[in-house]
């Protein structure tokens, strides 16, 4: 199982229409390694919050990318990921596409039902 973190985003649920806080599972800036006493895994972040990761001058910083988007360019500071999520109200399985600038989830690109997983994004 790969390491992951959580990004919290406010969005209407595409299944029930209720405004909800969606908890999106991301592999960006996630790793079972870390500093003594804590790992880059299973942490919650708000949209726009800097995710804990290696310092920029550390050679491991560049491994922040999840590489789960076929449109991404290696070496770019931008990555996108379709993340698993679910509605806390109706429990519908969802996806949320997030755009990252390095180790920051910048914005929501799309929200939909998991059955309609977007083309070009790995599950």
List the predicted regions and their residue ranges.
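Short, flexible, mixed-charge glycine/proline-rich loop motifs
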Residues: 1-9, 74-82
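Amphipathic, positively biased hydrophobic alpha-helical segments used for protein targeting
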Residues: 11-13, 114
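Short cysteine-rich clusters marking metal-coordination/redox-active sites
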Residues: 13-16, 87-90
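Short recognition patches in nucleic-acid-associated and regulatory proteins
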Residues: 20-73, 98-101
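A short, surface-exposed interaction/processing loop segment used at functional sites
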Residues: 100-123
């Amino acid at each position: 199982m790969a390491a992951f973190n959580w990004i919290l985003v406010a969005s209407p649920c595409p299944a029930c229409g209720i405004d909800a806080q969606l908890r999106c599972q991301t592999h960006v800036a996630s790793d079972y390694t870390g500093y003594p006493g804590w790992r880059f895994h299973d942490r919650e972040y708000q949209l726009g919050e800097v995710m804990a990761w290696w310092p920029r001058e550390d050679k491991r910083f560049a491994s922040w990318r999840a590489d789960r988007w076929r449109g991404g360019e290696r070496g770019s500071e931008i990555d996108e990921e379709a993340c698993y999520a679910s509605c806390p109200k109706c429990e519908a399985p969802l996806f949320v596409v997030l755009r990252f600038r390095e180790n920051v989830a910048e914005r929501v690109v799309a929200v939909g039902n998991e059955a309609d997983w977007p083309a070009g994004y790995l599950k």
